[in-house]
Amino acid sequence: MGPASLAEKMEERFTYGQYYQWDDGERWELIDGVPYNMTAAPVRRHQGILVRVSSRIEEFLRDKPCQVYFAPFDVRLPDFSEQDDNDVPTVVQPDLVVVCDEKKLDDRGCRGAPDLVLEILSPSTSRKDIGVKFSLYERHGVREYWIIHPAEESLMVFTIGEDGKYGRPQGYGRGDLAISTVLEGVELNLEEVFAE
């Protein structure tokens, strides 16, 4: 079956092994085996924000063991029972990830939870980013989840607590200085991030 018919068969579940074989030129994510089409290209503002955030984070992480990657970059999130990548039912392509454990990195991307995930909301992805992916990242132990809302010029930072749950978000607006509690020294001037 080709990926074009996948969206019509949402009751069927897929794995990373199947996903890796799809070659229709479209971008897909699998969340708990359910395919999500990622084909729509991000708008110019989205891309500008991503470039500014990634370059700023890379600057702070220079000479540290952490690596910054941005989409398309596969992040495989296995449940405890999946030893083989081919059986993993979840592979996502966040807008940006920071991985500090090089053992999680391979030629196909990242296997396991990144230290930080950033998603930039768009009309086509906001429900998934705020709902489905929030729960997914929390469940898999992503230490810090950043959600940027370009229209509101805001950033919400969720940090995982000792209970394995995200607590109340730290909210930031244009002009604020956002500080990571997970990546020492990483801070973003949101005036620069949202500049046109």
Regions found by a protein language model. Give the residues of each.
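Gly/Pro/Ser/Thr-rich low-complexity, intrinsically disordered segments predominantly at protein N-termini
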Residues: M1-E196
